[in-house]
Design a protein with these regions (language model features):
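Serine-esterase "nucleophile elbow" of acetyl-processing enzymes
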Residues: 1-41, 51-59
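Active-site environment of divalent metal-dependent phosphoester hydrolases
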Residues: 9, 46, 141
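Acidic/histidine-rich helix-loop elements
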Residues: 11, 36-44, 72-76, 158
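A short linear-motif detector with a strong N-terminal bias
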Residues: 15-16, 43-44, 112-113, 139
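Alpha-helical cap/lid subdomain in secreted, periplasmic
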Residues: 31, 49-167
């Protein structure tokens, strides 16, 4: 899994992060997959693009790409984010590696035009590169009544899922 602090498991014991929990779920459900935690706290789409070749050992036959949250936090132009993600998927396509793209959803604080441009990146890339696609790691944390992320599922920083949120 190529990602940032959400993938890495920021603020959690190593075995309680997303990758180990997902690995456990897959194993319990008899899915023969070995997940590798390629999450780096603070990573951006550019950082992910720059370290991709280093992560692609011959045994890798699929990659989950969960990047873009730090691009958002830093207010990077959506075109910059999209270009970096395109480089990642061009490389994966050339190597014949299947991919799952996990999107990010922009808040409104950068304005409606920024949100529109940013939120269009992920479905567009999923279509362009024929990727498996999940709209956000946060989707399961959204309260159906309020349509907001349940704060009891987040760490004190309000950004990273706590142990219950990872579950």
């Amino acid at each position: 899994m190529l990602g940032d602090s959400l993938t890495q498991g920021y603020g959690l014991e190593e075995k309680k992060g997303l990758v180990p929990k997902l690995q456990n779920w897959l194993s319990t459900n008899n899915v023969e997959v070995l997940l590798i935690n390629g999450g780096v706290s603070g990573d951006t789409t550019l950082g992910g693009s720059e370290r991709l070749d280093w992560l692609l050992t011959p045994s890798i036959n699929g990659v989950v790409v969960a990047l873009g949250g730090n691009d958002l936090l830093r207010g990077f132009d959506p075109k910059f984010t999209k270009n970096n993600l395109q480089e990642i998927f061009k490389t994966l396509k050339l190597k014949g590696i299947n991919s799952l793209l996990v999107g990010t959803i922009s808040p409104l604080n950068y304005g409606p035009q920024f949100k529109k441009e940013h939120d269009a990146i992920y479905p567009s890339l999923a279509s362009e590169y024929n990727l498996f696609y999940v709209d956000s790691l946060f989707s399961p944390l959204i309260d159906k009544k309020t349509q907001e992320i349940s704060v009891n599922l987040l760490q004190a920083d309000g950004i990273h899922p706590n142990e219950k949120g990872v579950e």
